[in-house]
Amino acid sequence: MLDLGLTKMALIGVVALVVLGPERLPRVARTAGALFGRAQRYINDVKAEVTREIELDELRRMKSEFEAAATNVETSVQDNLRKHESELNDAWNSGTSVSPSIAGGALEDVGNAGNTSWPGSTPAAGAKRKNWRVRQTAMPTWYKRATTRRTRVQSGAARVARHTPATMRRPTRFF
């Protein structure tokens, strides 16, 4: 902000000491420091507010650009839908006359539909697909073990006793 070197600061201090005197100099220095700090804080606040306003301006501009792009996409989709809807309505109203562009070549395939069959349409393939679906929805055993709620809870000691071989167990005595 101000280009004050060490020599300039010393010169200002000596002049202030001569003009103000040693009694009033500390109080004036404190007041000047406080005012200087307030000025710096005020300047920093103004800078922050200006940058915030600039960022808000940029965000508003970006928002308006995105809204314009969204409306352009929406209008193009609506126009496209209206065009295809009118084509389909014309084809529906005309009855038998269907344009090949709308049908996608389906008119040519209608004559061949009885002659060709889907390769996987045999009964064995149907059963295989059914088994595949069953396997697809089956839950893995590791997942069942990890997520199911235990109904038979055992303590650690009971579990050890259960899985310890008979030769390693202590003999039980009954009176």
Swiss-Prot record:
TM segment ranges: 1-21
Entry annotated with the keyword Cell membrane: yes
GO molecular function, one term: protein transmembrane transporter activity
GO biological process: protein transport by the Tat complex
Keywords (A to Z) from UniProt: Cell inner membrane, Cell membrane, Membrane, Protein transport, Translocation, Transmembrane, Transmembrane helix, Transport
Gene3D superfamilies from the UniProt entry: 1.20.5.3310
Protein's UniProt keywords contain Lipid metabolism: no
Region (Disordered): 104-132, 155-175
Annotated membrane topology: Single-pass membrane protein
GO CC entries: TAT protein transport complex
Tree of life domain: Bacteria
Compartments (UniProt record): Cell inner membrane
Biological role: Part of the twin-arginine translocation (Tat) system that transports large folded proteins containing a characteristic twin-arginine motif in their signal peptide across membranes. Together with TatC, TatB is part of a receptor directly interacting with Tat signal peptides. TatB may form an oligomeric binding site that transiently accommodates folded Tat precursor proteins before their translocation.
Family membership noted in the UniProt record: Belongs to the TatB family.
Quaternary structure and interacting proteins, as annotated: The Tat system comprises two distinct complexes: a TatABC complex, containing multiple copies of TatA, TatB and TatC subunits, and a separate TatA complex, containing only TatA subunits. Substrates initially bind to the TatABC complex, which probably triggers association of the separate TatA complex to form the active translocon.
Protein name, per record: Sec-independent protein translocase protein TatB
Organism encoding this protein: Paraburkholderia xenovorans (strain LB400)
